[in-house]
Amino acid sequence: MSDERYAASDGGGTEVGSGTRGRTTVVTKPATRPQRPTGKRSRQRAANASNTGANVEVEESSTQAAIAKEGKVKKPKKSADRSANPIVFIYNYLKQVVGEMRKVIWPNRKQMLTYTSVVLAFLAFMVALVGLADFGLAKLVLLVFG
């Protein structure tokens, strides 16, 4: 959803000038990072990601060239400490789950009411459809087999 729709209600998003003949002008505030994710990618973050991607490729190619010069490929050793303690594994897993749940964009009250009413209306329609089909087939069976 677009944030411009809600900007007029909070008083900071759109302003109508006296000589604009009813056209609106969108006034944006300086880019600040929101407290919670909004679901939109910021331009600054996208630009940083493209710059770091180029740096990583350069580093990888230089590392591969150094390994090719040596002629030996060393395999990294797996640490035995990672799988040793299942309690630490569960703790880390739950910590990651909480971190991912914080990234989720939760619906507001209006969206929840809309989604709930749509689901309940669909449920009522399907119950009526199945009920009528059952009733009709029961009557048909009674007519055929008497």
Swiss-Prot record:
Residues 1-81 are annotated as: Disordered. This is Protein translocase subunit SecE. InterPro entries: SecE_bac, SecE_sf, Translocase_SecE/Sec61-g. GO terms for cellular component: plasma membrane. The chain crosses the membrane at residues 118-138. Residues 10-20 have a biased composition (Gly residues). The keyword Magnesium does not apply. PANTHER family: PROTEIN TRANSLOCASE SUBUNIT SECE. Keywords: Cell membrane, Membrane, Protein transport, Translocation, Transmembrane, Transmembrane helix, Transport. The gene is secE. GO terms for molecular function: protein transmembrane transporter activity.
